């Protein structure tokens, strides 16, 4: 489905990604983890077309999409819930979800997807008429994910879904990420919380200083001495 091949990218003259290669398969949950500043968000932005590549390529469903305009990436079946949530605060929960389905012309399908998101996140159903700015941080994260799902993506990109969210809500959100994957979408989740991400991902890539430092099945990484010591605090 998604392949990054030897991707080099950055901002202006500052190259921050140095030969990133990774893969996400159909209906698979993959984690991209590592410390702040490792280049995880930049990697997602290369996929969505927000950051131009200076080397390598991004391939999606066997097609090179490097350099694709941001607005065209959604039409390929890729959707992103960015870091910081970025919901429309002056719109209601329902209106935010409708905005997420702006490419969907079938009204019945829009209604069906909204109903599914409300079943996934009952709190949003309870607050469907509230302004997004009145929601808690966790509820806004639910809304941001729901809005990203509205386009019916085959690949969902999630950037730091646990950031600024209460632990009890984070656990609930991660359970729903698994449900989204089971419903048919592959998921690439970026996280600083390594243990949390590895618990739901089939495979993971550990990124440090713009490079992939480790990769493999999550179960193996959870028993890796470097991961245990550096990220999970287990000596």
Model-derived segments and spans:
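ABC-type ATPase nucleotide-binding domains, specifically the catalytic core motifs of the NBD
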Residues: 12, 30, 68, 93-112, ...
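The feature captures the beta-strand-to-loop junction immediately N-terminal to the Walker
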Residues: 33-35
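Helix-to-loop junction immediately C-terminal to a conserved catalytic motif
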Residues: 48
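Conserved ABC transporter NBD signature motif
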Residues: 56-65, 76, 109-114
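Conserved ABC ATPase signature
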Residues: 131-135, 139
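ABC ATPase C-loop
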Residues: 148-149
């Amino acid at each position: 489905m998604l392949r990054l091949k030897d991707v080099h990218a950055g901002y202006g003259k500052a190259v921050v990604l140095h030969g990133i290669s990774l893969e996400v398969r159909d209906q698979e949950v993959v984690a991209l983890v590592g410390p702040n500043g490792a280049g995880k968000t930049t990697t997602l932005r290369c996929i969505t077309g927000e950051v131009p590549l200076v080397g390598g390529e991004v391939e999606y469903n066997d097609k090179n999409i490097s350099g694709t305009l941001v607005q065209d990436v959604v039409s390929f079946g890729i959707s992103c819930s960015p870091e910081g949530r970025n919901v429309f605060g002056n719109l209601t929960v329902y209106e935010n979800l409708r905005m997420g389905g702006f490419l969907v012309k079938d009204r019945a399908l829009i209604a069906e997807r909204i109903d599914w998101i409300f079943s996934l996140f009952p709190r949003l159903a309870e607050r469907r008429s509230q302004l997004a700015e009145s929601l808690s941080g966790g509820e806004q994260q639910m809304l941001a994910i729901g809005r990203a799902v509205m386009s019916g993506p085959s690949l969902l990109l999630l950037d730091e879904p646990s950031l600024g969210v209460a632990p009890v809500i984070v656990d609930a959100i991660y359970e729903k990420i698994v449900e989204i994957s089971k419903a048919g979408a592959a998921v690439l989740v970026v996280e600083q919380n390594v243990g949390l991400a590895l618990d739901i991902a089939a495979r993971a890539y550990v990124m440090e200083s713009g490079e992939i430092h480790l990769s493999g099945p999550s179960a193996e990484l959870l028993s890796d001495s470097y991961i245990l010591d550096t990220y999970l605090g287990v000596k």
